[in-house]
Amino acid sequence: MIYIGLPQWSHPKWVRLGITSLEEYARHFNCVEGNTTLYALPKPEVVLRWREQTTDDFRFCFKFPATISHQAALRHCDDLVTEFLTRMSPLAPRIGQYWLQLPATFGPRELPALWHFLDSLPGEFNYGVEVRHPQFFAKGEEEQTLNRGLHQRGVNRVILDSRPVHAARPHSEAIRDAQRKKPKVPVHAVLTATNPLIRFIGSDDMTQNRELFQVWLQKLAQWHQTTTPYLFLHTPDIAQAPELVHTLWEDLRKTLPEIGAVPAIPQQSSLF
């Protein structure tokens, strides 16, 4: 099994594509990267609505709130974690994984806090961790310690591939904004648990995106044999994310026939 989705399920420009709700999005994709929870907890009635708009085979991959990962730096935040997991509990059977997006200031010295945090989490969910500190990409003892600790706990190391957006010509504000915000870190395709999560940050150059994505075809085919990967496709202007899906899908299908036909979303160019 492989899960493929986008960083969010709605965008004003997707309305003309027929994607007007989570329910409609879930007809095309089997998972979503839940960025909204990084910034605020959804209201209880909203969580219930999300449950009503999806089926049991759909998966959410929500980020832990920034109040936990950034402001508390994983320390003394048991109440915040309990509040978050309780709020999301109506969706428990549909959680692909909860994951931490740690800031670049969270380095090797903070690993004891990470281990304590992960060890205190309930065991019924899968978890992931995205790191951004340079030493965790230097292939030294610090990175080995990180990978070993995640592996021992069965926690996925979230993989960020931002090569396309940083290789792009900065000709638009969307590109420039993404280049400022998305970390420029090496791509370390490390498998530490059974649900590897890949965040592919494309540019607005679909030819380049396809070229840079080729390395993932072999890796996904390999991992698919023993794990359940998650692939999330980003573009600087999220309005273009469905176009990236169309660009990469046939290559993915040749490698992983089980994903079936490309989602039946009209391409932007066909609407005018």
UniProtKB/Swiss-Prot annotation:
PANTHER family named in the record: UNCHARACTERIZED PROTEIN YECE (PTHR30348), UPF0759 PROTEIN YECE (PTHR30348:SF9)
InterPro entries per UniProt: DUF72, UPF0759_sf
Pfam families: DUF72
Protein name in the entry: UPF0759 protein YecE
Similarity comment: family membership: Belongs to the UPF0759 family.
Organism: Escherichia coli (strain K12)
Coiled coil residues, start to end: none
